[in-house]
Amino acid sequence: MSSESRSASSPVAPDDIEEGVVLRPKFDAHGLVTVVATDARTGDVLMVAFMNDEALDRTIQTGEAWYYSRSRKRLWKKGETSGHIQKVLEMRVDCDQDAVWIKVDQTGGAACHTGRHSCFYRRIDRGGDGAPVLIETDAERKFDPDKVYGK
C-alpha cells in the first residue's frame, strides 16, 4: 500500500484497524509512530525509535530499518554511519496500529550509538536512600563511538 493511500483521511471502522488486513498506521500529531526493534535471534529489546510514513515505506520496501530522527529532523538508515545495519526479518503492528515491532538481524552486534548491543544497558534500582539509581548491566562495547562517529 502506498503512503498516499495510507494517509488518506477516509474514516476507518475500528474493526478494520484491529482485525483487518490493511496496514493503516496511526501516526501521532508529529507524523510519527513508535517502533520497538528486537533481536530476532535472542528476543532482546535493542532500541525504541520512531518512523514517519517515508521511513516505514523504505523499511517495507528495502527490508532494512529506516527511522526518523526527531533531533536531526531527517530520515536515517540504521547503520548508515556505523555499518551496523538492521535487516528486518519480521514486522508487526499492535492492535490499534499506533506502534510497530520489528524483529531484526543486527549486523555488527551493536544497535546502540554508545557501542553496546542494546540501548537498554542500565537497570533502574533503588539506592540506599530509596532514590532511583542506574546500574549498568552491559558494559561491553562492540565499537568505540568516538572512532565511528568522529566525536
Swiss-Prot record:
It catalyses: 1-(5-phospho-beta-D-ribosyl)-5'-AMP + H2O = 1-(5-phospho-beta-D-ribosyl)-5-[(5-phospho-beta-D-ribosylamino)methylideneamino]imidazole-4-carboxamide. Pfam families: PRA-CH. Mg(2+) binds at residues 94, 96, 98. One of its GO terms (cellular component) is cytoplasm. Pathway: Amino-acid biosynthesis; L-histidine biosynthesis; L-histidine from 5-phospho-alpha-D-ribose 1-diphosphate: step 3/9. Coiled coil: none annotated. GO terms for molecular function: magnesium ion binding; phosphoribosyl-AMP cyclohydrolase activity; zinc ion binding. It comes from the Bacteria. InterPro entries: PRA-CH (IPR026660), PRib_AMP_CycHydrolase_dom (IPR002496), PRib_AMP_CycHydrolase_sf (IPR038019). Binds 1 Mg(2+) ion per subunit. GO terms for biological process: L-histidine biosynthetic process. Zn(2+) binds at residues 95, 112, 119. It is found in: Cytoplasm. HAMAP family: HisI. Catalyzes the hydrolysis of the adenine ring of phosphoribosyl-AMP. Homodimer. This is Phosphoribosyl-AMP cyclohydrolase. It comes from Rhodopseudomonas palustris (strain TIE-1).
